[in-house]
From Swiss-Prot:
<dbReference type="InterPro" id="IPR009615">
    <property type="entry name" value="Desmo_N"/>
</dbReference>
<dbReference type="Pfam" id="PF06771">
    <property type="entry name" value="Desmo_N"/>
</dbReference>
<feature type="compositionally biased region" description="Low complexity">
    <location>
        <begin position="110"/>
        <end position="121"/>
    </location>
</feature>
<protein>
    <recommendedName>
        <fullName>Uncharacterized protein in POL 5'region</fullName>
    </recommendedName>
</protein>
<feature type="region of interest" description="Disordered">
    <location>
        <begin position="110"/>
        <end position="172"/>
    </location>
</feature>
<feature type="compositionally biased region" description="Pro residues">
    <location>
        <begin position="122"/>
        <end position="136"/>
    </location>
</feature>
Amino acid sequence: MASYRYRAPTRYINADVSVDNLLRTIDSMSRQCRSRNETESELARVRSIITLYRPHLQNRVDLQVAELVLEALMPPNGAQEITHNFNYKYDYNTNSGGGAPPPFFPVGPARPTDAFGAPIAPSEPTPASAPSPPKADAPNPIQQNVYINSAGEAARPSSPRPPPPPASGGGAVALMQVDDADELALKNDYDTLTREYTLVSYKRLVRTLVPVSQKYIINDLFVRGLAKLCSVELLLNNDLGALVDCINREAALNIRPDTPDLCRLLVAMIRGFFILASSATRQEYTLARCDSAALVEEEVWSVKTALDQRMSRLADELETARDKLTQTASRLNRAELELRESRETTLMLKRQVEMNEALRRPARFDDEL
């Protein structure tokens, strides 16, 4: 008991390690995982909103969210797909010339829209019989930018017209139509992923997207990049390995990341701390109310203080018991000595009585004669 009391705490690389280091590490990794999941969820929500209002961008899975936002804000006046080098050139209306704004010349057969998807009516074309102004007096036509001027400044009101057919030029993007079987398979896997957001359902959806992409998209790089999404499990394994390495480093343990009993091992360690804390505080102990590393450290410190106080009380009680035992042993020794002396005195008295009796017997015999 005394050796346990004065034993030094475990040290590893000149640092004290205890269960609170393990709990602090687990809490930190949990916060990082929750933050990463929230970020990915927000990005997926932004992408779904963009594809809801811009259905023609559903096939642009190769773009990041920032590039997809820029692609969605561009007016459909021609081929304006974003490349990864961000070399797109924007033309802004400077409204130079002082007088009335120059006439708007629509570029391409596509109908312009504003930033929110509302169609903008183009200006009426100049009649063929009207004489064209001289080239020296006419300013250079400036393409109208729908993000600077409003819809009223962009064009005069006109009767609505049906949208023109998609352009057949090389820069136009043709929308992909998926057959019913592929659409049903994608819908089933997507619904499964929505109900059960697990790694298995995620990989099942990716494995369904790969053959569909090979069937409708002639781009080997896109298909290989889509298939690469199945390796997301490696990221999770790396995160688990980093967690186990941190636990081994901070707590001086030797845990393997691939052990099948990793969860049970960690639970056994935490449960052992609960048992020790319950024994120290003499009540059922739990960390359910502790949601941060600071609170866990406070609880560990309080348990350590209670355990030290109890050990101190036990040591004092043991010392008192030893003193009482010593006093009792001393009294027993004295009582034994007294008993021995009493026995010796009794024997001496008995001998004297016998001697007196022996001396009286001859005198009595003489009297009888």
